[in-house]
Design a protein with these regions (language model features):
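Charged DNA-binding/catalytic regions of mobile-element recombinases
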Residues: 1-289
Length: 289
């Protein structure tokens, strides 16, 4: 075990320093290093290459569950336990969460809708329940605001809109684009918080025009839009945290890449636990077939 620690830390300390710290001889270390690798060690080295490949391809986003599942789907022996150990030994950790303050402004006198979902975020068929929210992204040029519409049956991001201002026009654009992409479905429950943008006359007018049903979380209820908050959390951790955007254009490209290329479409790479570890689009395609 001590000799293995040497190998993992050679880039930080000289062999002489590590020998003194761990009270072992140089000759003993070099003798250990010259031995042929066991079958297990050789297998671990090959697995390590695959783990690093997946980890780098997904920009440090996935943890051990998604990496092990993806490698298993590729036909490679990659138990969760082995992946955890190898990632830990090499200091590879999925991107960690960072706290972000809320953007919702519920202090207004606009009409609000009742909470029809009541934390039931399961949908039995497509276009039965949608959820929406606004999140924000900092760039060196200032803030960007992202409005997302999420389909609860497949957890697919139906559509989204992004702007320098957090206005009613932003959420209206996201909803209109979602309607067009889904071929104008009727009777969809569209759930959001009680922010002034969602309570605006312009946004609520779309519900009348397109025969949608408005639903809103209760004021101060942090679980009222939990499915959307969960998506926001994943987005911030996997696409935003640790990134520095010099321009708004850089951030917009990152948003597009995450939603349209990574989250919605990549079959195995975006392993969604609630969908049996397949992508939202693959889940929908299987159900239709």
């Amino acid at each position: 075990v001590k000799y293995a620690m040497f190998k993992n830390n050679e880039m930080y300390f000289t062999v002489g320093v590590m020998c003194r710290l761990l009270s072992v001889s140089r000759s003993g270390y070099y003798s250990w290093r010259s031995r042929p690798l066991s079958d297990r060690d050789q297998a671990n080295q090959l697995l390590l290459i695959d783990i690093k490949r997946v980890f780098d391809e997904e920009k440090g986003r996935p943890g051990s569950p998604r990496i092990s599942k993806r490698l298993q789907d590729e036909g490679k022996p990659a138990s969760r336990h082995r992946v955890v150990k190898l990632m830990r030994d090499n200091g590879w950790r999925a991107k960690a969460a960072k706290k972000y303050k809320a953007t919702t402004n519920s202090n207004h006198s606009l009409p609000v809708a009742p909470n029809l979902l009541k934390q039931n975020f399961r949908a039995d068929v497509p276009n039965q329940k949608w959820v929406s929210d606004i999140t924000y992204i900092w760039t060196e040029e200032g803030w960007l605001y992202l409005a997302v519409v999420l389909e609860l049956y497949s957890r697919r991001v139906i559509d989204w809109a992004i702007s320098e201002r957090m206005t009613a026009a932003l959420v209206c654009e996201a909803l209109i684009m979602a309607l067009w992409r889904c071929h104008m479905p009727k009777g969809v429950i569209v759930h959001s918080d009680r922010g002034s943008q969602y309570c605006s006359a312009a946004y609520q007018k779309l519900f009348t025009q397109h025969q949608l049903i408005s639903s809103m979380s209760k004021k101060g209820d942090c679980y009222g839009n939990a499915a959307m908050e969960s998506w926001n959390h994943s987005f911030k951790v996997e696409a935003i945290h640790g990134e520095r955007f010099l321009t708004r254009s850089d951030a917009k490209y990152q948003v597009f890449d995450y939603i349209e290329v990574y989250y919605n479409r990549k079959r195995v790479k975006r392993l969604h636990s609630k969908l049996g570890y397949v992508s939202p689009e693959t889940f929908e395609a299987k159900k239709v077939a």
